[in-house]
């Protein structure tokens, strides 16, 4: 089975296993955390860094870090790409300089099939024989994928030929959103993808510790990537305040009786030993 077939099979299996049907996927961060149990964080990173999956085999812990970006469709592709590495357990893959490993190629294909399943595309477009950029826009807006991913899928499903695919792959999402009237939605997506985001399970544990008075507001603020003041205000509005640490006080009357044996002091000591 080639890489494309492996990726498609895994994407179909993932959707089936988690009863996702053919519909567009919503919050991918929450989806990955809930289905895999792994922590996912949206973090600051260099412009050339998109995502990274780290795995500790000794503790069986996996962490996925994704760069925050004003390009929401790219971020969704990166999230799906890193999910592929988790599902295929690509922990030890090595890439030669200047080339892309088979694992990376397979992860790209998985992301495309997961985000835009062929049957879902056919369900949206039906038996149309001729498509326009308005149809491309509808696919991009519905499934929240890049025009490049949409164009590849449309070509694979034989809605368009290779020449149109190449033309449409050069279009960016902002162009489509502006032309077809959903720029406001796109800007809302940009706001979400360009914001830091702490792993939900880790943040929940930290907030629980804050409530118990053993985790500081600074720790919460660091996780959320904001100020201490904002963290405290946000928690207070939710009715979450730290419990004061109560140090038990014990009075002398509460202490148990202590018996001291002083009999050894009564032993006569020899005088002027020689």
Question: Which sequence ranges carry the predicted segments?
Answer:
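Active-site hotspot residues in diverse enzymes, especially metal/ion-binding acidic/histidine motifs
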Residues: 1-274
């Amino acid at each position: 089975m080639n890489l494309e077939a492996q990726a498609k099979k895994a994407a179909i299996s993932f959707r089936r296993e988690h009863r996702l049907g053919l519909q567009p996927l919503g919050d991918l961060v929450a989806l990955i955390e809930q289905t895999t149990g792994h922590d996912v964080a949206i973090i600051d990173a260099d412009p050339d860094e998109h995502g990274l999956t780290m795995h500790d085999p000794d503790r069986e812990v996996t962490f996925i870090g994704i760069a925050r970006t004003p390009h929401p469709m790219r971020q969704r592709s990166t999230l799906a790409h890193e999910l592929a590495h988790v599902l295929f357990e690509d922990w030890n893959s090595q890439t030669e300089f200047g080339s892309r490993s088979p694992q990376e190629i397979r992860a790209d294909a998985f992301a495309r099939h997961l985000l835009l399943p062929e049957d879902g595309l056919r369900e949206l477009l039906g038996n149309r024989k001729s498509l326009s950029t308005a149809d491309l826009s509808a696919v991009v807006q519905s499934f929240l994928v890049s025009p490049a991913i949409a164009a590849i899928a449309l070509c694979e499903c034989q809605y368009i030929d290779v020449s149109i695919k190449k033309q449409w792959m050069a279009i960016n999402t902002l162009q489509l959103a502006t032309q077809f009237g959903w720029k406001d939605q796109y800007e809302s997506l940009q706001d979400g993808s360009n914001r830091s985001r702490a792993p939900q399970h880790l943040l929940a544990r930290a907030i629980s510790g804050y409530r118990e008075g053993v985790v500081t507001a600074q720790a919460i603020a660091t996780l959320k990537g904001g100020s201490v003041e904002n963290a405290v205000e946000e928690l207070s509005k939710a009715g979450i305040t730290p419990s004061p640490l109560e140090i038990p006080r014990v009075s002398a009357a509460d202490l148990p009786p202590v018996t001291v044996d002083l009999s050894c002091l009564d032993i006569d000591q020899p005088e002027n030993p020689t």
